[in-house]
Amino acid sequence: MKNAPSNRLNLSVQYACNREGLPLRADFVRWARAALVGGGEVTIRLVDADEGQSLNKEYRGKDYATNVLSFPYDTEPVVMGDLVVCPSVVSKEAAEQNKPLEAHYAHLTVHGMLHLQGWDHDNDDDAQAMEDEEREILAAMGYPDPYAV
């Protein structure tokens, strides 16, 4: 008899930058779990702008630091992948968009977790579906619509 896939989330958080006010591992676990269908093996690495820029250039061909990068490895039997989050970009965006910082971290974690599960926003229909899913997940946790700017 084949074992059923696990619903367990094994989440590691790597704090590779010195920045006050970063979310705790427990926050990332809550946000990631809310977006995850089934189980997962995920690492979230918080990086400085230099590392974020280097990774974005290497993997996406864009020479700037971005808010979150997703590196999916597998979806069966559990989701496996890495998220790279750049706190300096997240903080700047939250301030510019007049969003609570915690809500922006929650949104980007959910967004990244959906990418790890195969969601994308390569065309308008996919983007709308992904945004709707993000809104639903975030609302269930009590966060505002991240796209109502």
UniProtKB/Swiss-Prot annotation:
Pfam family, one: YbeY
GO biological process, alphabetically ordered: rRNA processing
Subcellular location: Cytoplasm
GO CC terms, sorted: cytoplasm
Classification via InterPro entries: MetalPrtase_cat_dom_sf_prd (IPR023091), YbeY (IPR002036), YbeY_CS (IPR020549)
Cofactor: Zn(2+)
Origin: domain of life: Bacteria
Keywords of the record: Cytoplasm, Endonuclease, Hydrolase, Metal-binding, Nuclease, Ribosome biogenesis, rRNA processing, Zinc
GO molecular function term, any single one: zinc ion binding
Enzyme kind, highest EC tier: hydrolase
Its job: Single strand-specific metallo-endoribonuclease involved in late-stage 70S ribosome quality control and in maturation of the 3' terminus of the 16S rRNA.
Family membership noted in the UniProt record: Belongs to the endoribonuclease YbeY family.
Protein known as: Endoribonuclease YbeY
The gene coding this protein: ybeY
